[in-house]
Amino acid sequence: MRYTIRPLDTATWAAFAELAERNNGVFGGCWCMACHPEVSRTDAAQNRAGKERRVRGGRAHAALVFDDSGTAQGWCQYGSPEELPGIKHKREYDKDPPPPPDWRITCFFVDKKHRGQGIARAALEGALDQIAHLGGGLVEAISEVTAGREAQGRFLFSATVELFEQNGFTRARQVGKHAWIMSRVIEPT
């Protein structure tokens, strides 16, 4: 299947919101706010409103993946470290921080009925393309190794090390039992 990638912005907000609502606000109401500073751990409506404010204010970035019918089926969130200060394994990360990235990739989501169809790959490739158009630079992600083990999908909201490696990222440092800081420089276009 061919996918269309579009940035998350005011024109695509309704499609993003429909995908999130179709999936219980994503992970029970996160709305892909967990890495933003104003996340609520208990109020899905607050997260939805916060995400919409960020999108309408140009302070949220994501590559949305649309299927042939024009329905959003997944995304990859990215942004500056200031936009996305909340990261997995932060305590271990801060013990020996890598060079400051220009961009962070923090979150993937794929509709439950469409997993295993290449949507996360399309989302990552779309995010990297959008980053290149925004000036490129050092891109960082913290992801999970899945080779040789069975990983629960709910823990793979930051995708897999293998997917990042297939897209030119290298492992910088291990920060959790299966978690690695991944990095790659993206040239501007």
Residue ranges and their predicted role:
Residues 105-110, 116-133:
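Conserved acetyl-CoA-binding loop-helix of GNAT-fold acetyltransferases
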Residues 124, 131-153:
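Conserved GNAT acetyl-CoA-binding A-motif
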Residues 71-107, 115, 151-158, 165:
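Conserved acyl-donor/pantetheine-binding loop and adjacent beta-alpha core of acyl/acetyltransferases
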Residues 16, 60-76:
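Conserved beta-hairpin
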Residues 154-161, 165-167, 172-189:
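C-terminal "cap" of GNAT-fold acetyltransferases
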Residues 46-64, 81-86, 104:
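A short helix-loop-beta-strand connector motif used in the catalytic cores of GNAT acetyltransferases and
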Residues 1-35:
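Conserved N-terminal entry element of GNAT/NAT acetyltransferase domains
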Residues 25-57:
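Aromatic- and Gly/Pro-rich amphipathic surface segment
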